Design a protein with these regions (language model features):
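A conserved beta-strand element that flanks and buttresses the S-adenosyl-L-methionine
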Residues: 129
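A short, conserved alpha-helix within the catalytic core of class I
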Residues: 137-148
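N-terminal, positively charged/glycine-rich alpha-helical extensions of SAM-dependent methyltransferases
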Residues: 1-26
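Conserved alpha-helix/loop element of class I SAM-dependent methyltransferases that forms part
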Residues: 37-55
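Class I SAM-dependent methyltransferase SAM/SAH-binding core
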Residues: 60, 65, 69-117
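Class I S-adenosylmethionine-dependent transferase superfamily signal
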Residues: 73, 148-149
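Short conserved loop adjoining the S-adenosyl-L-methionine
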Residues: 118-123
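Hydrophobic adenine-recognition pocket in adenosine-nucleotide-binding enzymes
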Residues: 133
Length: 150
């Protein structure tokens, strides 16, 4: 895992944060250092998803970033499900695909680049996760996104 040093140097001005290639390359380190109990959150998501996943359905990860949650779900869910990861950043999805390939992810999956602010098509879902994603959705669009899930 690459170490996050993106904001180490002094900057004249700070641009808007984006999920760029530089961020994608250190994102896992960023989460480990900046999100208290991140591994425990992952463990709890997997525990609940295992209980709710149903054979023949889809498991969605909205804002899948580098694929950590998808990987953990795929290693623990025993049901015959398809995994679908959505993210707005092509760089994050590239890192996600790389991680799934490196870990020889044996499950059926799709990775889709889309702006969750525009809504998302959810069908035949038994589990939908949105770990640390909703805060990046515009407040006026959150109800619509949640409605797409329900």
């Amino acid at each position: 895992m690459s170490k996050d040093e993106i904001f180490k140097e002094n900057m004249q001005s700070i641009a808007d944060f984006t999920f760029s290639k530089n961020v994608a390359s250190v994102f896992d380190d960023m989460l480990e250092r900046c999100v208290p109990l991140y591994q425990e959150i992952q463990r709890m998501i997997v525990e609940m998803a295992v209980d709710f996943s149903v054979d023949g359905t889809n498991v969605y990860d909205l804002g899948c970033s580098t694929g950590t949650t998808l990987l953990n779900l795929g290693q623990n869910i025993q049901s015959n499900v398809k995994f679908i990861g959505y993210d707005y950043s092509e760089e994050m999805l590239a890192k996600c695909k790389q991680k799934l390939v490196e870990h020889q992810f044996p499950r059926d999956y799709d990775l889709i680049c889309t702006d969750l602010n525009q809504g998302v098509h959810i069908e035949n879902a038994s589990v939908v996760t949105m770990l640390l994603t909703l805060q990046f959705i515009r407040p006026l669009r959150r109800d619509m996104l949640i409605g797409n899930i329900l």
